[in-house]
Design a protein with these regions (language model features):
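Periplasmic N-terminal accessory/gating domains of Gram-negative outer-membrane beta-barrel systems
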Residues: 80, 85-96, 110-210, 214-219, ...
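Flexible, surface-exposed loop regions and adjacent strand-edge segments
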Residues: 128, 132, 251-254, 294-310, ...
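Transmembrane beta-barrel strands of outer-membrane/channel proteins
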Residues: 115, 235-241, 280-286, 352-356, ...
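Short strand-turn segments of transmembrane beta-barrel domains in outer membranes
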Residues: 200-207, 218-221, 228-269, 282, ...
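Transmembrane beta-barrel wall of Gram-negative outer-membrane proteins
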Residues: 256-360, 380-397
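Periplasm-facing N-terminal accessory domains of Gram-negative outer-membrane beta-barrel systems
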Residues: 19-110, 114
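Structural signature of outer-membrane beta-barrel domains
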Residues: 80, 118-120, 169, 181, ...
Length: 426
């Protein structure tokens, strides 16, 4: 008995650290002519396995619905079908959708209604912005940080740190699919989430619900995409280069579109319709930067030369060469996400999600403009492995269990081995 109580306490305390990843749909269905409630009317979310029926009062409720835009269909024998298009489900929110059905003597008649997004959310108790995947696609940005800086109350410092309402970067809580994802070392996000992978982005500032127990100034809650019953794919790319005639910026006169590019692709669809779906994506990004130094000397004080032995030492008859320009603020990165959703039984959903990313970069150092070889390189690696299990107990309650492992590794060095002989001047 004591063991059971301990497990229950752990689950209750653990729930405080979980962010919302699903929404709720509810409403009342009546006969348009008589105003009487419709008992047993079917409510179906099209192209999904979600559905329910109305009770004796014409009321219905559906829980645990992933956030996105849906078409909701009301149908009942003896009435025209009523299809509501553009219904938006939001994480941690209740979407109210009522319906008035018209009696029909011809089977198959249908009425289509286009829903509109409410300008005011009456159940919101804090300052928040909710950005859907459709809105993200229309923004001229490629990083989550660029989306955040467009929101009210959010500022970005020179190092890229996110501040909300004047607080510190470590006071912002990041969550991915309801799981805390903040890096305990610097307060940033532990893994890189690409905009293409986000189904819904919530930016909350001010007061918070109890589920965000560790947040002080703000919460960034990201819900990643799931696969559906139809195959979908996308490819996004851009390429370019920095150009300037200002002599302050060296070596920006020649155009080379391979110096700055990004390629991302995604594919989703069914493995077994209505039972198993997948979502997979990847991105490669590179930039040689816009700040260049004239590489003139080696780390040992020699004039640059052809390092035929690749040891950075001037050996034997190796020939000296003219100084050359080299990037001082470059970066190169890749990331991938793979997610599989299982629906083995009605009301039971399993989700397995993996996110991997790696980044190499150098930061600009004014003192090393002529000695770029002495500049250290930064290495970032992030990994997220998550398992989510949810089960709907009744129209008004469900259970959810999240198990995850998150790793974030940051290193910065000139040579990987601290005992490397090249750290010593020959």
């Amino acid at each position: 008995m004591k063991l059971i109580l301990n497990i229950i306490c752990i689950l209750i305390l653990h729930q405080i650290l979980l962010g919302g990843t699903t929404g709720k749909l509810s409403g009342v269905l009546i006969d348009k002519e008589t105003g009487e409630p419709l008992i047993g009317c079917n409510i179906i979310i099209e192209d999904t396995y979600f559905g329910t029926s109305s009770n004796e009062k014409g009321e219905y409720t559906m829980l645990n619905i992933p956030p996105r835009t849906y078409s909701i269909r009301f149908e009942m024998i003896g009435y025209k079908k009523l299809v509501n298009k553009g219904v938006i489900i939001i994480s941690d929110k209740t979407t109210s959708l009522n319906g008035e059905l018209v009696s029909s003597v011809i089977a198959g008649e249908e009425v289509i209604v286009v829903a509109e997004k409410k300008l005011i959310q009456f159940d919101v108790t804090q300052s928040e912005a909710i950005i859907s995947s459709e809105e993200l696609d229309g923004m001229p940005v490629t990083e989550v940080s660029e989306v955040l800086r467009l929101q009210g109350g959010v500022t970005v410092d020179s190092d890229g740190g996110i501040h909300m309402r004047g607080g510190r970067t470590s006071e912002v809580s990041y969550m991915v699919d309801g799981v805390p994802m903040s890096d305990l070392y610097d307060g940033g996000i532990g893994v890189q989430i690409e905009n293409d992978n986000i189904q819904e982005l919530q930016v909350i500032s001010g007061t918070f619900n109890a589920e965000y127990g560790r947040a002080l100034t703000g919460v960034v809650n990201m819900v990643t995409k799931d696969g559906g019953n139809y195959f979908e794919g996308s490819v996004h790319t851009y390429a370019g280069d920095y150009q300037s005639s200002d002599k302050t910026y060296n070596n920006l006169t020649n155009l080379n579109i391979e110096d700055d590019y990004s390629i991302s692709a995604s594919l989703s669809g069914p493995i077994l319709k209505d039972k198993i779906t997948f979502y997979s994506s990847g991105r490669v990004n590179q930039s040689k930067g816009w700040l260049n130094g004239l590489q003139t000397f080696t780390i040992y004080g020699d004039t640059v030369f052809n390092d035929e032995n690749n040891n950075r030492y001037l050996d034997g008859n190796e020939q000296q060469k003219d100084p050359y320009y080299k990037g001082l603020n470059w970066h190169s990165s890749w990331s991938t996400q793979n997610k599989v959703t299982f629906n083995p039984l009605k009301g039971t959903i399993f989700k397995i999600n993996t996110i991997l990313n790696s980044r190499e970069s150098q930061d600009y150092n004014f003192a090393l403009q002529l000695l770029e070889d002495a500049q250290i390189t930064n290495f970032n690696y992030g990994r997220f492995l998550g398992l989510s299990i949810s089960h709907t107990l009744s129209p008004t309650s469900f259970l959810q269990l999240n198990i995850s492992e998150n790793k974030y590794n940051y290193e910065s060095y000139l040579f990987e081995d601290p005992l490397d002989n090249r750290y010593i001047t020959p």
